């Protein structure tokens, strides 16, 4: 299977290290072989090392170094936020963030729900075994 996530202008990437960790950005220019100029609607345009970026499958159609308003229009037209939220990678990050925000009582309630669900599964399995025998 060929590699499909190339560093290119318009590629949506996820910052995986630093103060902007977890933020979706768009590559607007390639500075050199180790750095790119990235931009997002809610941040300043800044250079970032490729090692701090995780490339996604999402790509928007923009020119090199667009104005902020053009970038925002392109992001909205491509519906990047919704596509990211629907992707398995995006959903995993959302689940991870919500689990990290749980307090002790929430974790306790989840534990009780899991126990209750497992008991229900066990009862149904016992019924099926009884009817099969």
Swiss-Prot record:
Keywords: Ribonucleoprotein, Ribosomal protein
Superkingdom of source: Eukaryota
Pfam families to which the protein is assigned, alphabetical: Ribosomal_L14e
GO biological process: ribosomal large subunit biogenesis; translation
GO cellular component, one term: cytosolic large ribosomal subunit
Keyword flag Signal: no
InterPro entries assigned: Rib_uL2_dom2, Ribosomal_eL14, Ribosomal_eL14_dom, Translation_prot_SH3-like_sf
Single GO term (MF): structural constituent of ribosome
CDD domains: eL14
Family: Belongs to the eukaryotic ribosomal protein eL14 family.
PANTHER family: 60S RIBOSOMAL PROTEIN L14, LARGE RIBOSOMAL SUBUNIT PROTEIN EL14
Protein name (database record): Large ribosomal subunit protein eL14
Organism the protein comes from: Pisum sativum
């Amino acid at each position: 299977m060929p590699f499909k996530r190339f560093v290119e202008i318009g590629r949506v990437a996820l910052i995986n290290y630093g103060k902007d960790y977890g933020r979706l950005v768009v590559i607007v220019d390639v500075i050199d072989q180790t750095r790119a100029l990235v931009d997002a609607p809610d941040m300043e345009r800044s250079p970032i090392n490729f090692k701090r970026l995780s490339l996604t499958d999402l790509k928007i159609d923009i020119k090199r170094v667009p104005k902020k308003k053009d970038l925002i229009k392109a992001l909205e037209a491509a519906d990047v936020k919704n596509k990211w939220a629907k992707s398995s990678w995006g959903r995993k990050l959302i689940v991870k963030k919500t689990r990290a925000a749980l307090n002790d009582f929430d974790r306790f309630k989840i534990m009780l729900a899991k126990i209750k669900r497992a008991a229900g599964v066990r009862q149904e399995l016992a019924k099926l075994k009884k009817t099969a025998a």
